[in-house]
Amino acid sequence: LKRRAEQQAETRLRIVEAAVALHGSVGPARTTYSMVAEAAGVQRHTLYAHFPDERSLLLACSGLAVERDPPPEPANWPEGADRLRAGLSAVYAWYRRNEDLAGCVLRDAEVHDLTREVSELRLGPTARRWQENLGAPLDPVQRAVLRVMLGFPAWRSLVRDSGLAPEQAVAAAIRAIEGSVA
């Protein structure tokens, strides 16, 4: 009995890992159960036995991704003047490590209700903590710019589209935030 439970757990993990890889390459909205089953090396009925619907699979995938590389927590950032730099550096480093998956998931969240729901569930509270924590000493206009700069599209534009090094992207974001006074 114990061996069977271990095999089922291994199969489940293999399915979730295959789905996460597909979500990072084609996106959750375009990932089909057939694609996941093939990538995991299981039959479709095995996949359905573990994940009877798309929501259960997406929740498992997002849970695994966040467990393996949790988004940065503001509690770990220093107080005072270095907080904004530390926070943006941590968020941007997390985006860099999760670029493919984040890019596909956030793209699909624009058009796929379930992806949007699960993204909000997994990342919404943390993103709000980033904004509240870093935005506390800022005026309303600066907080608005902070919200933009904390977004994945801003990071991608600064680093990928503009070719800035990570520390340059953080410095540019800080200048944009601090330079926008109400």
What are these regions, as identified by a protein language model?
Residues 89, 93-106, 111-144, 170-181:
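Amphipathic alpha-helical packing segments from all-alpha helical-bundle domains
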Residues 132, 143-166, 179-182:
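Amphipathic C-terminal alpha-helical segment
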Residues 51, 107-112, 149-152:
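Short helix-capping/turn signature of helix-turn-helix
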Residues 45:
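Key DNA-contact positions within bacterial/archaeal DNA-binding proteins
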Residues 21-25, 31, 59-87:
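Amphipathic alpha-helical linker/stalk segments
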Residues 14, 18-26, 72-73, 101, ...:
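Solvent-exposed, amphipathic alpha-helical segments
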Residues 1-26, 30-42, 50, 55-56:
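Basic, helix-initiating cap at the start of DNA-binding domains
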Residues 50, 60, 172:
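Residues in the recognition helix of alpha-helical DNA-binding motifs
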